Curated annotation (Swiss-Prot):
Signal peptide: none annotated. Belongs to the vasopressin/oxytocin family. It comes from Cyprinus carpio (Common carp). PROSITE patterns: NEUROHYPOPHYS_HORM. GO terms for cellular component: extracellular region. Keywords: Amidation, Disulfide bond, Hormone, Secreted. The lineage of its organism: Eukaryota, Metazoa, Chordata, Craniata, Vertebrata. This is Isotocin.
Amino acid sequence: CYISNCPIG
């Protein structure tokens, strides 16, 4: 992911 929006993006 880009920011902290995903669990393990």
